[in-house]
Structure formats: structure tokens, C-alpha cells
């Protein structure tokens, strides 16, 4: 698979096993679990502190979110937690990546989240996966993409404290997408690029939108 050719190894397979220490695992899970709270916090900040731009900021967030899911309809890529489960970790470790055809049309089984299994945030991630994680929504990473939009909106707000508060959650969220095997590294990179592109495109399209 091209990720192995680009990075020299499979990040989604080796990241968690290399950094399996409980505090690191919990920080990763905390970052991933912070996804929806980040969206809510940015929206609430604009509502209470910059109400004139609340409608614009909300539109940018929601439009970004739904654009990713439209992409997933036309580019159905299975994340590693689903693909590795389907083909077996031994095949992945040996550099063999068999095609699975329409397997994910009828199967949604995934690997358990790697890391410290007794952690509070680990449990939150497992609950989130059970409630809403689906096989073919991996490329680009909407978690990285929409959280990148959140960071740009925090920057746009001019509130340095908001930006600095969100920064560590964003950092660990981006890493966690690969660490917990929800995404391949290339998915996270694509999420960063597309999230930035969506932010500027949607902000340009909504220049005249005010409450």
C-alpha cells in the first residue's frame, strides 16, 4: 500500500504500539473525544461574544461538516480499524493488502481501539465508535478537517485565549486519528489541507452574511 511506500512503515499499525504508555494513550483519546465539544465551543463563542458573525461561523462549520459526508458518498474509503479487521493484522504486518470488494456494504466490524483500555477517555472513544463510526468515511479525515475549520474560526475571532485553549486538543486530535486507527496518515494530512481550503472558500462565499 502506498502509505508504506511513502512513510517506510504503516503509521496506523505502528503508532499506538510504539507509544502505548497509558498517559499518551489517554491524551490521544482525549483529543479524539474533543471533536464535538470543539465544534460546540466555537459556535457558542461566536453566539455569545461575536453574535454579528454567529450565522456566518455556524454556516461555515455546518457546511464543512456536510461537504465531507458528501465526499464520503462518492469516495468511500475504509479506515484502518475496519480494513485491518477485515483482512487480518498479519497480512498488514507482512505488507499484503488484499482487496475486499463490497465487503463493507454488509460488515461494520472494527478493531478495538489500541492503547490503555482502562482509561476514561478510552471509554469515551469506544462509545463514540460504537454509536457513529462507519467503515467508508476515512478520506479525507473529517475529524481533522472540521477541527481545522474550528481552529481557523478561533483565529478569526481574534480571541487568543480561545485559540490557545483549543490548540492542545486540536494537536492530539490530529495525532489520535492515526493512533486509534480511525484514519491513515494520508487521511489526516488530506483533512488538514481540505479543512483549510474549505474554511477560506466558505468564508469568501459568506462575506456578506451577518446576523
Explain the meaning of each model-derived region.
Residues 1-5:
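Conserved small/polar residues in nucleotide/adenosyl-binding loops
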Residues 74-156:
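Membrane-interfacial catalytic/cofactor-binding modules of polytopic membrane enzymes
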Residues 6-49:
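Hydrophobic alpha-helical segments and helix pairs
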Residues 40-75, 82-98:
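Interfacial segments of alpha-helical transmembrane regions
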Residues 31-43, 66, 141-150:
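Hydrophobic alpha-helical transmembrane segments
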Residues 118-211:
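Membrane-embedded catalytic cores of phosphoryl/pyrophosphoryl-handling enzymes
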Residues 27-30, 56-60, 161-171:
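Alpha-helical transmembrane segments of integral membrane proteins
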Amino acid at each position: 500500500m502506498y502509505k508504506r511506500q511513502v512513510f517506510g512503515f504503516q503509521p496506523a499499525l505502528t503508532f499506538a504500539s510504539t507509544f502505548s504508555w497509558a498517559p499518551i494513550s489517554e491524551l490521544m483519546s482525549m483529543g479524539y473525544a474533543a471533536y464535538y465539544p470543539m465544534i460546540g465551543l466555537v459556535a457558542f463563542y461566536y453566539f455569545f461574544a461575536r453574535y454579528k458573525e454567529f450565522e456566518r461561523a455556524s454556516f461555515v462549520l455546518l457546511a464543512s461538516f456536510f461537504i465531507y459526508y458528501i465526499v464520503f458518498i462518492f469516495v468511500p474509503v475504509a479506515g484502518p480499524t475496519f480494513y485491518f479487521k477485515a483482512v487480518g493484522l498479519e497480512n498488514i504486518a507482512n505488507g499484503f493488502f488484499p482487496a475486499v470488494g463490497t465487503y463493507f456494504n454488509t460488515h461494520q466490524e472494527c478493531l478495538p481501539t489500541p492503547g490503555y483500555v482502562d482509561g476514561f477517555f478510552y471509554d469515551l472513544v469506544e462509545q463514540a465508535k460504537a454509536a457513529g463510526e462507519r467503515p467508508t468515511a476515512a478520506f479525507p479525515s473529517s475529524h481533522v478537517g472540521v477541527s481545522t475549520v474550528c481552529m481557523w474560526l478561533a483565529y478569526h475571532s481574534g480571541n487568543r485565549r480561545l485559540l490557545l485553549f483549543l490548540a492542545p486538543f486540536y494537536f492530539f486530535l490530529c495525532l489520535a486519528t492515526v493512533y486509534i486507527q480511525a484514519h491513515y496518515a494520508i487521511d489526516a494530512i488530506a483533512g488538514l489541507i481540505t479543512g483549510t481550503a474549505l474554511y477560506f472558500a466558505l468564508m469568501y462565499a459568506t462575506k456578506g452574511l451577518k446576523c
